[in-house]
From Swiss-Prot:
Pfam families on file: ACPS
Similarity section: Belongs to the P-Pant transferase superfamily. AcpS family.
Gene name in the database record: acpS
PANTHER family reported for this sequence: L-AMINOADIPATE-SEMIALDEHYDE DEHYDROGENASE-PHOSPHOPANTETHEINYL TRANSFERASE (PTHR12215:SF10), PHOSPHOPANTETHEINE TRANSFERASE (PTHR12215)
Stated name of the protein: Holo-[acyl-carrier-protein] synthase
C-alpha cells in the first residue's frame, strides 16, 4: 500500500548561488557521509549532486507528510548510492520500502519518493503529496 508520495524540483542556478554565498549551506543539507562524496566530485558535478540531494530530501519529507521543519531535518535524511550509483534513502522503518528517483537536466534537479508499507493497514495511513 502506498502511504506517501513526494516530489521536488530545484533550479541548479539557485543551488549554485546559495553555495557561492554561504558554504555552511553544505553542512545544513548534507550528512557527513554525503559531504565526503561531494568533496570527491569535480566542481561542475558538485552542484548537480547537491541539488539532487536537496530535492530528494525535500521529496522524502513531503512523502512523510511533514515537510522539512520541526519533525524532520535535512540531517535526518541520508541518501546513499549502491555500487551502480542508484540512490536510496538510508532511513527505513519496519515494513516500509522507500522508492527514490533523482534526475538532472541542464537547469534542474528533480526527485520523487514513494513510500510503501507492507502488512495490515493502519488507520493513520494516508497518501500525502
Amino acid at each position: 500500500m502506498i502511504v506517501g508520495i513526494g516530489i521536488d524540483i530545484v533550479e541548479l542556478e539557485r543551488i549554485q548561488s546559495l553555495l557561492e554565498r554561504n558554504r555552511k549551506f553544505l553542512d545544513r543539507i548534507l550528512t557527513p557521509r554525503e559531504r565526503e562524496q561531494f568533496d570527491q566530485l569535480a566542481p561542475a558535478r558538485q552542484v548537480e549532486f547537491l541539488a539532487g540531494r536537496f530535492a530528494a530530501k525535500e521529496a522524502y519529507a513531503k512523502a512523510l507528510g511533514t515537510g522539512i521543519g520541526r519533525h524532520v531535518s535535512f540531517q535526518d535524511i541520508e541518501i546513499v548510492s549502491d555500487e551502480y550509483g542508484k540512490p536510496s534513502i538510508a532511513a527505513r522503518r519496519d515494513g516500509e520500502v522507500i522508492h527514490l528517483s533523482i534526475s538532472h537536466s541542464r537547469d534542474y534537479a528533480i526527485a520523487q519518493v514513494i513510500i510503501e508499507r507492507f502488512g495490515p493497514a493502519k488507520p493513520s495511513d494516508a497518501c500525502h503529496g
